[in-house]
Amino acid sequence: MNLGLAIFLIIIALLIGLVGGFYGARAYMKKYFQDNPPISEDMIAAMMAQMGQKPSAKKLNQVMNMMKHQQQK
């Protein structure tokens, strides 16, 4: 096999691996954060309590829905 062709194929394989790895990692992280959001309802309730608000279930659901809506954009 020609040396130039071998080098070309190695470079192409590396580029394909880079692109595939990037998109694979991106999809994994999106799924991870969708399944395990960085903030939970308990954290939001504690934050509301610290701000002097009474954390009702309705308020918690509104905040969680807003966060989920922002993640989908």
UniProtKB/Swiss-Prot annotation:
The keyword Membrane applies. It holds the Pfam family UPF0154. This is UPF0154 protein LJ_1506. InterPro entries: UPF0154. Belongs to the UPF0154 family. It comes from Lactobacillus johnsonii (strain CNCM I-12250 / La1 / NCC 533). It is found in: Cell membrane. The keyword S-adenosyl-L-methionine does not apply. It is a single-pass membrane protein. Keywords: Cell membrane, Membrane, Transmembrane, Transmembrane helix. The chain crosses the membrane at residues 3-23.
